[in-house]
Swiss-Prot record:
Family the UniProt entry places it in: Belongs to the ATPase A chain family.
Protein purpose: Key component of the proton channel; it plays a direct role in the translocation of protons across the membrane.
PROSITE patterns in alphabetical order: ATPASE_A
Primary site of residence: plastid
Location within or outside the cell: Plastid, Chloroplast thylakoid membrane
Record's keyword terms, sorted: ATP synthesis, CF(0), Chloroplast, Hydrogen ion transport, Ion transport, Membrane, Plastid, Thylakoid, Transmembrane, Transmembrane helix, Transport
Gene Ontology MF, one: proton-transporting ATP synthase activity, rotational mechanism
Protein's recorded name: ATP synthase subunit a, chloroplastic
Complex and partners: F-type ATPases have 2 components, CF(1) - the catalytic core - and CF(0) - the membrane proton channel. CF(1) has five subunits: alpha(3), beta(3), gamma(1), delta(1), epsilon(1). CF(0) has four main subunits: a, b, b' and c.
TM region(s), chain numbering: 38-58, 95-115, 134-154, 199-219, 220-240
Membrane topology: Multi-pass membrane protein
Disulfide bonding pattern of the chain: none
Amino acid sequence: MNVLSCSINTLKGLYDISGVEVGQHFYWQIGGFQVHGQVLITSWVVIAILLGSATIAVRNPQTIPTGGQNFFEYVLEFIRDVSKTQIGEEYGPWVPFIGTMFLFIFVSNWSGALLPWKIIQLPHGELAAPTNDINTTVALALLTSVAYFYAGLTKRGLGYFGKYIQPTPILLPINILEDFTKPLSLSFRLFGNILADELVVVVLVSLVPLVVPIPVMLLGLFTSGIQALIFATLAAAYIGESMEGHH
């Protein structure tokens, strides 16, 4: 009976944890709309970290970069390489967009593991990585969709819509459906991976609070970085595809 009682209490504790992470939110009323306040708070923190780091690193630019300037120039070169590989020679105007997506998602993902969000108490819910909320990932995916539609229409005009009947008009429904599945796959892939990683860490910490969670947290940091790279790479690939006019 003691074992059964202990198991029930453990399951109840895990249920309470998952309820806090998934089902409860801290809402704000803004202009008649109800928004997730904790997502705005953590998103502003991530944006402040990015802007503050960039400002400090490049406030005194040097011809031969060192320290923070060298790091940010390396990151910029990396983003340029990703953009050029996926988009082609006309990648230049899209580097800021791809870079913003990559850096925001990367820092958001890592903030879930590295920043002590849990010590900040809210009336409802808890603070967590912005990408832990489906609203954030859907918004990023929709921005990507708008970007590749804009890229295609800017480059090819109304001829862009001709892709829906290529290589045969029979594929029209499938080609239209593809444009709806792209943002769905982008948003749910990112959301699912980040949410699952945070829940696994919370569960392990509650059960075995000392050594076991550390390797999982390190693996989570690695996969979080990979997810940011995947999202940015796919966004660039979709933009390049819309500009080229073929799949």
